[in-house]
Amino acid sequence: MTVDEVKGQVYDIIVTKMGVGKEQIKDDSKFTDDLGADSLDTVELIMEFENKFGIQIPDEDAEKISNVQDAINYIVEKKK
């Protein structure tokens, strides 16, 4: 899975879960500050990333995923 494929799917998940337009999302968008996620939204995003990509994201790692690029990098690394 390429970085671009992961990025596209991460963006799609954010659009679906957060109800924001794809044009509002940037790689450095913070889930809480820029995209309006609360703590429950963030947990749901992490769970959706786990389901979509077939990976496990431990809580200590999830706490470090604060923006879109963090999520993309983490998923790409786990899928290697």
From Swiss-Prot:
Keywords: Cytoplasm, Fatty acid biosynthesis, Fatty acid metabolism, Lipid biosynthesis, Lipid metabolism, Phosphopantetheine, Phosphoprotein. It is found in: Cytoplasm. One of its GO terms (molecular function) is acyl binding. Residues 4-79 form the Carrier domain. The modification O-(pantetheine 4'-phosphoryl)serine is found at S39. InterPro entries: ACP (IPR003231), ACP-like_sf (IPR036736), PP-bd_ACP (IPR009081), Ppantetheine_attach_site (IPR006162). The keyword Phosphoprotein applies. One of its GO terms (biological process) is lipid A biosynthetic process. 4'-phosphopantetheine is transferred from CoA to a specific serine of apo-ACP by AcpS. This modification is essential for activity because fatty acids are bound in thioester linkage to the sulfhydryl of the prosthetic group. Pathway: Lipid metabolism; fatty acid biosynthesis. Its main location: cytoplasm. Carrier of the growing fatty acid chain in fatty acid biosynthesis. Belongs to the acyl carrier protein (ACP) family. This is Acyl carrier protein. It comes from Chloroherpeton thalassium (strain ATCC 35110 / GB-78).
